[in-house]
């Protein structure tokens, strides 16, 4: 164990956290797209020279887990050809990226000629080229039909901006001004982080800072090992189901085999062969899914760095499978599907080991991208993911209900829906409704968080809509004996309502065009419940009904609570009903 002065350790740790927070604020305040500045679909991290992650932000989990293998891949790609002033860009899943819309910037930090740190920023660009706006192409049979792949490439070389390379990238993207603005914001964030780190090195020197970082990683390792020692040794298995894509694949299953031995864990993933559809997951993304499933169980205190995973080994199964995809498998939906299902499989396995530790599953992402030409602004092209459309409910745990409208499992509460008024200001749409959905939270002693309903209309133009995600066929999984009776309210939905009132309902990923006067309605599922619903206190169920979160029928059918037409609790009927069940 390192002997580091605890005061110095606390100051260095605080300085690292400040550097990361300043990176986040820079992105929020200087980026161009609503996906960045409203929804915060980005993540920042700091790495040391090894390169190992020394600090992750409280950002998007699916980004952060994949950064660990991606950083090593990028650094190894350039080897000794990394110089002061270089900036590297990358999105390719074949190089441990997540999906090609998540573009990552890596800035090496040199101090007195020595590489000491990396500042890293990953964010979801609203477009990456390809035949479908926003990149989600449900008809893609290969990765080449999804958009621009960017293997590790230097956008700045020894401090010089490479305009030819940057122009090549941006020329292949829709709504170029938005993508360029977000790319520049990423550069600003990495540079701000670099400045803070150099100030830290000026104060304490390389050796002292490295000693503190080693201790912080060791501390995270000790926390995780202590948790695993409290879990009974054994083999645990969990299987989660991917919904029918409508492409002749049927339902697909992912199984996680978790072995706990002392203070170590080994995770083996079993998945079917990769498919000619955009739900394949390459290794970097799948590793992140395993880590997310583990962290739904672990609940360890900070610091959060690569030390957490020293005692965890991951085997994704044979190459060419759904969770260990190889070129040219299409993949762009992978950060939601199958990643959320993969994380669920790990969570289900760990629930067998220690059910009191797990969180029920969160609602899966079930959202839309929109694109068109803005009639208010010289018909300029726009394209964006509507982040308010992917706000599902959080899972409950042994002590509390799931949070409503907290975002999908892949983001674990870090994704913001953004202000509806700012969405309308930024894009030519009218929001008719944005609300929580009654009976959408999974039933349990602790109820799952409610999902959301968004209704929008294009204004004075035809709007392309891309529906993606899951949760439209299978309800969110609960935990510890939770069970649902009302299934329909707990499912996501995508509805195209025409001017005459006729509606088209979609349960799979789809492309459609909406005209002025028509509505696109997107419903996100709620989170899973925890524990037996019949153990939920009567007063709590009554409060849920009065707040519109549970219907009178839902109270009776799922919780055994009888409420009359005046909204009053019938205790005698309730006790009889619960006794009969």
From Swiss-Prot:
Similarity section: Belongs to the HyuB family.
Oligomeric and partner information: The caprolactamase is a heterotetramer composed of two alpha subunits (CapA) and two beta subunits (CapB).
Keywords: Hydrolase, Metal-binding, Zinc
Documented EC number(s): 3.5.2.-
Residue positions binding Zn(2+): 41, 99, 102, 124
Pfam family, one: Hydantoinase_B
Record note on domains: The tetrameric structure and the presence of a connecting tunnel suggest that the activated lactim moves from the CapA active site to the CapB active site without release to solvent.
Protein's UniProt name: Caprolactamase subunit beta
UniProt signal peptide: none
Co-factor binding details: Binds 1 zinc ion per subunit.
A single BP term in Gene Ontology: glutathione metabolic process
Reported effect, residue 41 to A: Loss of activity. Shows significantly reduced thermal stability
Entry cofactors: Zn(2+)
GO molecular function: 5-oxoprolinase (ATP-hydrolyzing) activity; metal ion binding
InterPro entries per UniProt: Hydantoinase_B, Oxoprolinase-like
Outcome, altering residue 99 to A: Loss of activity. Shows significantly reduced thermal stability
Cellular component, GO annotation: cytosol
């Amino acid at each position: 164990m390192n002997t580091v002065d605890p005061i110095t350790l606390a100051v260095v740790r605080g300085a690292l956290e400040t550097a990361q927070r300043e990176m986040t604020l820079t992105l929020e305040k200087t980026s161009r797209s609503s996906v960045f500045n409203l929804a915060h679909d980005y993540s920042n991290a700091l790495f040391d020279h090894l390169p190992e992650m020394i600090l992750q932000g409280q950002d998007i989990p699916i980004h952060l887990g994949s950064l660990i293998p991606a950083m090593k891949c990028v650094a190894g790609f350039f080897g000794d050809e990394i110089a002061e002033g270089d900036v590297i860009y990358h999105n390719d899943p074949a190089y441990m990226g997540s999906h090609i819309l998540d573009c990552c910037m890596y800035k090496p930090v040199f101090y007195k000629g020595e590489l000491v740190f990396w500042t890293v920023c990953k964010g979801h660009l609203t477009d990456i080229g390809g035949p479908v706006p926003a990149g989600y192409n449900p008809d893609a049979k290969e990765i080449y039909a999804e958009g621009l792949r960017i293997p590790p490439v230097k956008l700045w070389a020894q401090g010089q901006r490479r305009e030819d390379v940057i122009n090549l990238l941006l020329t292949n993207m829709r709504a170029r001004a938005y993508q360029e603005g977000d790319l520049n914001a990423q550069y600003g964030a990495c540079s701000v982080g670099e400045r803070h780190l150099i100030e830290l090195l000026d104060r304490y020197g390389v050796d002292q800072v490295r000693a503190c970082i080693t201790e912080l990683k060791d501390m995270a390792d000790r926390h995780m090992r202590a948790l695993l020692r409290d879990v009974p040794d054994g083999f645990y298995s969990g299987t989660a189901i991917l919904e029918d894509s409508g492409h002749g694949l049927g339902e697909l299953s992912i199984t996680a085999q978790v072995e706990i031995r002392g203070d170590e864990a080994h995770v083996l993933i079993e998945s079917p062969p990769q498919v000619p559809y955009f739900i394949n997951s390459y290794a970097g993304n799948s590793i992140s899914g395993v880590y997310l499933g583990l962290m739904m169980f672990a609940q360890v205190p900070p610091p959060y760095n690569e030390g957490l995973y020293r005692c965890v080994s991951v085997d994704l199964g044979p190459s060419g499978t759904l969770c260990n995809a190889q070129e040219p498998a299409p993949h762009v939906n992978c950060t939601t599907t199958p990643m959320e299902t993969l994380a669920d499989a790990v969570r289900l396995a760990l629930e067998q080991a220690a059910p009191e530790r797990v969180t029920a599953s969160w609602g899966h992402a079930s959202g839309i991208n929109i694109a068109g030409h803005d009639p208010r602004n010289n018909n300029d092209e726009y394209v964006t993911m509507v982040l308010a459309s992917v706000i599902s409910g959080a899972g409950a745990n042994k002590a509390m209900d799931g949070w409503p409208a907290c975002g999908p499992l892949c983001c674990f509460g870090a994704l913001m829906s953004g202000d509806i008024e700012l969405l309308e200001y930024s894009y030519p749409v009218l929001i008719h409704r944005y609300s929580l959905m009654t009976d959408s939270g999974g039933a349990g002693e602790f109820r799952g968080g409610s999902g959301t309903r968004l209704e929008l209309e294009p204004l004075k133009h035809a709007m392309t809509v891309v529906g993606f995600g899951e949760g439209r066929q299978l309800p969110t999984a609960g935990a510890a004996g939770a069970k649902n009776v009302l299934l329909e309210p707990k499912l996501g939905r995508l509805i195209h309502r025409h001017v005459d009132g006729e509606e088209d309902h979609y349960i799979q990923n789809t492309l459609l065009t909406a005209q002025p006067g028509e509505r696109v309605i997107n419903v996100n599922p709620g989170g899973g419940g925890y524990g037996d619903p019949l153990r939920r206190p009567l007063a709590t169920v009554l409060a849920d009904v009065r707040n519109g979160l549970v219907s009178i029928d839902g109270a009776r059918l799922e919780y055994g609570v009888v409420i009359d037409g005046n909204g009053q609790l019938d205790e005698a009927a309730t006790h009889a009903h619960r006794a009969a069940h």
